Amino acid sequence: KEFGVGLTLEHLTEGHMIANELAKEKFPLAVGPTFGHATKFELQNKTWETPGILAKAGCHVSIITDAPVIPLHPLCAGFAIKAGMDEFDALRAVTINPAEHIGIADRVGSLEEGKDADIVIVDGNPFDVTGVIRHVLIDGKEVE
């Protein structure tokens, strides 16, 4: 804060334990990865409830996976919803919030005129495995 440096708090797998303190600080929070076993001491209390608890406390939450190749974000958002996170908070946690956290929200993260048109259109709930992808657009062009 003293030097005005942008800061994002990463991982926060046990952030639910200090949600009120984190909400006071107003730092962007990147929560995850939540998949896997709690083999490290600092993972003993990780839970899919963490993103929802932090969002309800007023935190600006992104869901992260540490999986650079396989796009697990929708699945992680679905697990967070199942654990009590609001669906719109979960959607924001994998779209506009991460874009804001890394400073590219002027181009991506939401549907607005002038932004990149990277869109997935789903028949059904996008966070439910029964949802069917109908269209994918990258830069406004449909891809097969």
Task: Locate the predicted segments by residue.
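Composition- and surface-driven signal marking solvent-exposed, interaction-prone regions
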Residues: 1, 9-13, 132-135
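His/Asp/Glu-enriched, well-ordered alpha-helical/loop segment
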Residues: 2, 20-122
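Catalytic beta/alpha-barrel core
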Residues: 6-15, 34, 38-40
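Charged/polar interaction segments and conserved charged motifs
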Residues: 14, 19-21, 138
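Glycine-/small-residue-rich active-site loops that bind phosphorylated ligands and cofactors
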Residues: 14, 68-69, 128
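C-terminal cap of metal-dependent C-N hydrolases
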Residues: 100, 112-144
